[in-house]
């Protein structure tokens, strides 16, 4: 007679069985969570749970202590004032970038300076940005010192207690100061030109016979000359007269840059005296020193922005 096989049966060592092989294997999930018979919770006794919890507490405490020790050792090797790696061959590099103001945070992707001469509201944001940017030069007076012709920030590297040179904003009084609305009201807008801060960087002077033609009549040893022109032939025809303040560009006495409280970044301004009305002019401004490279593709040593001064009647908004 053929033996009927139970579909739910399993074979253990060739012997058919329909029950668990061990008495302590739970039959239901509820028994797995709490087995009253064996006194276990999720398969472990109270003693077993206590041992494994203590083990992992000690293990992770040791791991955290080891990580904190490594972090402390690493932080001790860092200088809070100077990057660990800077200069040639690093991301920071040795070629300072060129920046400009006013740059509106509300339009971070735009390099256009556009306003209407007849509408004060159209250039209010530019005036506010210029004022905000220049405020830092007044607020650090007690942490800076006046530097004469023979003084410079070289003292900061020699003496850590020395104060940085105070930048004098009076060089912009003739047409590019807050009193004259930075020239925007009169249609002669001023733009701030600055260099990025590079630790330890200072301008290298050109030899007398190697000064670029663009700045030959304004170049002064020890300074960074600035030259702005139209980006294209058409722009060069329209840009008109450009005035530089100071005429020699950015004064070299404020270099090298050292990370210290009260440091004031030197700047220059360019004023567009005869820029045409209702025409867009693309401007290219370059900084000149022997150790500043120029590359159009990567925009090294230069900055681009657009200027458009409109002279149109202000359209009054009609109330609905």
Curated annotation (Swiss-Prot):
Signal peptide: none annotated. It comes from the Eukaryota. The chain crosses the membrane at residues 52-72. InterPro entries: Na/K_ATPase_sub_beta, Na/K_ATPase_sub_beta_sf. It is a single-pass type II membrane protein. Residues 73-320 are extracellular. The keyword Lyase does not apply. Glycans are attached at residue 140. Residues 1-51 are cytoplasmic. Disulfide bonds join 176-190, 228-285. GO terms for biological process: intracellular potassium ion homeostasis; intracellular sodium ion homeostasis; potassium ion import across plasma membrane; sodium ion export across plasma membrane. It is found in: Cell membrane. Its main location: membrane. GO terms for molecular function: ATPase activator activity. Disruption phenotype: Defecation defects. Keywords: Cell membrane, Disulfide bond, Glycoprotein, Ion transport, Membrane, Potassium, Potassium transport, Signal-anchor, Sodium, Sodium transport, Sodium/potassium transport, Transmembrane, Transmembrane helix, Transport. PROSITE patterns: ATPASE_NA_K_BETA_1. GO terms for cellular component: sodium:potassium-exchanging ATPase complex. PANTHER family: SODIUM/POTASSIUM-DEPENDENT ATPASE BETA SUBUNIT, SODIUM_POTASSIUM-TRANSPORTING ATPASE SUBUNIT BETA-1. The sodium/potassium-transporting ATPase is composed of a catalytic alpha subunit, an auxiliary non-catalytic beta subunit and an additional regulatory subunit. Non-catalytic component of the active enzyme, which catalyzes the hydrolysis of ATP coupled with the exchange of Na(+) and K(+) ions across the plasma membrane. The beta subunit regulates, through assembly of alpha/beta heterodimers, the number of sodium pumps transported to the plasma membrane. May also function in the peptidic vesicle transport pathway from the endoplasmic reticulum for the defecation behaviors. Belongs to the X(+)/potassium ATPases subunit beta family. This is Sodium/potassium-transporting ATPase subunit beta-1. The gene is nkb-1.
